[in-house]
Amino acid sequence: MSEVNPKIVIEAALFASAEPLTPERLQQLFDEQNPISLSEIKNLLSELKEDYRERGVDLQEVASGYRFQARPDFSPWLQRLWEKKPARYSRALLETLALIVYRQPISRGEIEEVRGVAVSSDIIKKLLDREWISVVAHRDVPGKPALFGTTKTFLDYFNLKSLEELPPLEDVVDLEKIEAQFGEQLALVVEKKAAEGTEPSALPLAEED
């Protein structure tokens, strides 16, 4: 095979991959006869991002690496490709997820203490199944309750490189503020994912407590 432009190889790999790719993973595409440094990979990624600046897709860096995705500006048109409405999220799920995001690591009991009601096992299971949260440790007290934290999958879903990019909450004990502020952000992401055809509908709907 004749010599290929490495930028084109990287572009093809990013489109072919179902998951974000790191510069290190992209470097593995090139053999010892045609080595390429990490700095070169990053430069080529920057060039690709610029190449697509006026296109319908964007090269986005998230926690797990780089990926191509549709620009949110085109969501009104892309939504017409899918008949399903995006899933609505229950207040209980929004509050539970927001508390994990902003107070991690946190136990189920601590979430219940703040919310004042029991946390549905179904909500915890769905967040775990979605891989938005995981058990990161166990509290060193009798019973050793699991402590939950967010994952790279969560960051990827929200197009974040780190939790530091999340908007601050002045008081995470204020559940009205949690639902309004975090819920608004989640709704925007869900709308975008629905436009891209990547938003599953397997999360609890608003009728849950």
Curated annotation (Swiss-Prot):
InterPro entries assigned: ScpB_csome_segregation (IPR005234), WH-like_DNA-bd_sf (IPR036388), WH_DNA-bd_sf (IPR036390)
Gene that produces this protein: scpB
Pfam family for this entry, one: SMC_ScpB
GO biological process, one term: cell division
Species for this entry: Coxiella burnetii (strain RSA 493 / Nine Mile phase I)
Role description: May participate in chromosomal partitioning during cell division.
Similarity section: Belongs to the ScpB family.
Entry protein name: Segregation and condensation protein B homolog
Compartments it resides in: Cytoplasm
Keyword Cell division included in the entry's annotation: yes
Entry GO CC: cytoplasm
Keywords assigned: Cell cycle, Cell division, Chromosome partition, Cytoplasm
NCBIfam families in the cross-refs: SMC-Scp complex subunit ScpB
Keyword Membrane: no
